């Protein structure tokens, strides 16, 4: 597990490399709730891997692009937070492109290829984004957040 500072550097680097909003990646990270080494089974037989919960459907393309076996890609993505974030940023960039540059639709498609089914996920990411913004504003201005 990376330190917060190193995680932030990875996130910013991945954001810049893939030209996707860092705050969107951060909100997705919060919603996904993953961590290094985590592998979650899905009903359709795929698995979600690591910090950003990268779906194993991406493994064949990544294995081809990196010229290494899918099993090795799986371990790397599952266990390396920085690489996991970088792959997530690449996926988000791909999904935004598929949505003709619409960031919100790209975020919805990050979770589900069908935009309609991605809407609930998009709502979660937007809520996470605003929650993070409130926390940052509160810290910046020395305001205490109300506890619910």
Task: Locate each region found by the language model.
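Catalytic glycan-binding domains that act on GlcNAc-containing polysaccharides
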Residues: 1-148
């Amino acid at each position: 597990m990376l330190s917060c500072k190193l995680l932030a550097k990875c996130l910013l680097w991945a954001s810049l490399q893939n030209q996707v909003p860092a705050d969107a990646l951060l909100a997705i990270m919060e919603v996904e709730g993953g961590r290094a080494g985590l592998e979650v089974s899905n009903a359709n037989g795929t698995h979600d891997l690591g910090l950003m919960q990268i779906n194993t459907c991406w493994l064949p393309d990544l294995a081809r692009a990196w010229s290494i076996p899918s099993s090795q890609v799986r371990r790397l993505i599952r266990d390396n937070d920085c690489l996991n974030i970088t792959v997530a940023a690449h996926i988000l960039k791909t999904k935004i492109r598929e949505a003709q540059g619409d960031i919100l639709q790209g975020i919805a498609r990050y979770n589900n290829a069908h935009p309609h089914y991605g809407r609930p996920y998009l709502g979660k990411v937007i809520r996470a984004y605003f929650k993070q913004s409130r926390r940052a504003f509160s810290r910046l201005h020395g305001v205490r957040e109300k506890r619910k």
